[in-house]
A protein has these predicted regions:
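Formylglycine-dependent sulfatase
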Residues: 2-4, 10-448, 453, 457-522
Length: 522
């Protein structure tokens, strides 16, 4: 063979090899696209709407580049609703049901009997039907007992704490009873490691000192979970729940003074660094294009604990009926589905995540199935989902969010407000501020207050606008449509009633039990 012919054949071989590599690469990309998406839900705790710099635009003097990256590569939502407190917000997301329906409205305390029922399926359990590995890392706050642990509700594994941080550190209070029996009965459990096969390990108390680095422990476990899922070639669902930024913030030495703006800003920067570690791991594993990433928080900002407290431009704060108690930051990256850099102003809520994710996993009719009765990870379940499937909207198949309304339930189980479209009607209002919102009762109004959340998103008109009374009076016609929304929603509780009564910080339930016991004894 001549040198020229040899060169010709070598060139042809190189071309064929290149074509083969391109075809093989295309096939690999197609296979990756066809895989069920991985889901990573990253949650802060009590992080205010205004705390990520994607929302505050740097006006708070620090940056959260990793949370901002999710917004830049995905979408930012201005009107995303959590709930009024920790337990309710987490229950809404993981069950897709109104927390009034699950009875998980009141903040869970050590020793409390209320918790997530096995009759209420979770996003994790439903994804097990589709072959997912499921892991929850970080704060749970959906019940104190073993039966309430995530690993009894669809998660393969769990590592985290069960309550808010200030409850975890109560045993270190100088007046805390020294009697071991008191702590055993009423004290917080430690940081729990559990598995779906029934193994449960208490890894020790979440002390003030451990709080400095517990999120690092949690993050290490979460990264390892993703590693193992990818090696097993299985789609995975990771719910990563930070302890930041709930009070009380205890920072390690390296995190203190980072911003020069105090403990909350320093904590947010540390927290954002943990978010960055998760995003970097997703990149390292080569699964970025097939992984949905959401960042959000459970409830509105807790402002009364400032300077160790969140920030929101909205009225009032956590545990009130006002927007400040319910609006949360939310950014979602979903390659190939959500347009990068987009901003969405429609109404959305945590309840919508479950049906949306299930649709992405190949189960768009899960809501209808569950209403008729559906086997979820080996359990027969029949429930009413209150969330909406957002996938057609995210794909651009419809122009608006399917959610047109949002119901604001108080932690006592009362319907305080309704939002439909741009209108918000207030049936009960919290007139207290600061810590007193946890103490003072809501005031029931004979005629609802009215707000337009487009022209008055911060609900200032009723106490600042000279013409508010006339404006409100001229729009009484909005009341009957609001009643129709409420009637339709409440009608669903006839077939699917609340699972349990929400807990109580007062004596009403104790007195009720005594009355029931007295009646039954007659």
């Amino acid at each position: 063979m001549t040198i020229r012919k040899q060169h010709h054949w070598l060139t042809l071989l190189a071309v064929l090899m290149t074509i083969g590599l391109v075809v093989n690469s295309a096939n690999t990309a197609t296979a990756q696209t066809k895989k069920k998406p991985n889901i990573v839900l990253i949650w802060g705790d009590d992080v205010g709407w205004n705390n990520p710099s994607a929302y505050n635009r740097g006006m708070m003097g620090y940056k959260t580049p990793n949370i901002d990256r999710i917004a830049r590569e995905g979408a930012l939502f201005t009107d995303w609703y959590g709930q009024q407190s920790c337990t309710a917000g987490r229950a809404a997301l993981i069950t897709g049901q109104s927390p009034f329906r699950t009875g998980l409205l009141k903040v869970g305390l050590p020793g409390a009997k209320e918790g997530l029922s096995i009759k209420d399926p979770t996003l994790a359990g439903l994804l097990k039907n589709h072959g997912y590995m499921t892991g929850q890392y970080g704060k749970n706050h959906l019940g104190d007992r073993d039966e309430h642990l995530p690993t009894n509700h669809g998660f393969d594994e769990f590592f985290g704490n069960l309550y808010h941080l200030n409850a975890e550190e109560e045993p270190e209070n100088e007046d805390y009873p020294k009697d071991p029996e008191f702590k055993k009965k009423y004290g917080p459990r430690g940081v729990i490691k559990s598995f779906a096969d029934g193994r449960i390990e208490d890894t020790g108390p979440l002390t003030k000192k451990r709080m400095e680095t517990v999120d690092e422990e949690v993050n290490a476990g979460a990264l390892d979970f993703m590693d193992r899922a990818v090696k097993a070639d299985k789609p995975f669902f990771l719910w990563w729940n930070s302890t930041r930024m709930h009070i009380n913030t205890h920072l390690k030495k390296d995190s203190k003074g980072k911003t020069g703006l105090g403990v909350y800003a320093d904590g947010m920067v540390e927290h954002d660094g943990h978010v960055g570690e998760v995003l970097d791991k997703i990149d390292e594993l080569g699964i970025t294009e097939n992984t949905i990433v959401m960042y959000s928080s459970d409830n509105g900002a807790e402002c009364f604990t400032w300077p160790d407290g969140g920030s929101t431009p909205f009225r009032n704060e956590k545990n009130s009926n006002w927007e400040g108690g319910y609006r949360v930051p939310c950014v979602i990256r979903w390659p190939g589905v959500i347009e990068p850099g987009s901003i969405h102003n429609g109404i959305f809520s945590h309840e919508d995540i479950l049906p949306t994710i299930l649709a992405a996993a190949g189960d768009p009719d899960v809501k209808e199935k569950l209403m008729k009765g559906y086997n979820v990870n080996g359990r027969d379940c029949k429930v009413h989902l209150d969330g909406y499937n957002l996938l057609p909207y995210f794909k651009g198949e419809v122009d608006e969010s399917p959610r047109k309304e949002f119901f604001y339930w108080t932690d006592d189980g009362n319907l305080a407000n309704l939002r439909y479209g741009r209108w918000k009607l207030v049936f009960m209002e919290q007139r207290a501020h600061g810590f007193d919102v946890w103490q003072e009762p809501f005031v029931t109004l004979r005629l609802p207050k009215l707000f337009c959340l487009r022209t008055d998103p911060f609900e200032r008109a009723d106490h600042e606008a000279i013409g508010y009374g006339k404006w409100r009076f001229e729009r009484i016609y909005l009341l009957v449509p609001a009643q129709a929304y409420v009637s339709k929603h409440l009608a669903t509780y006839k077939e699917f009633p609340p699972r349990q009564k929400p807990g109580s910080f007062a004596l009403d339930q104790v007195l009720e039990k005594l009355q029931e016991a007295g009646t039954s004894g007659r």
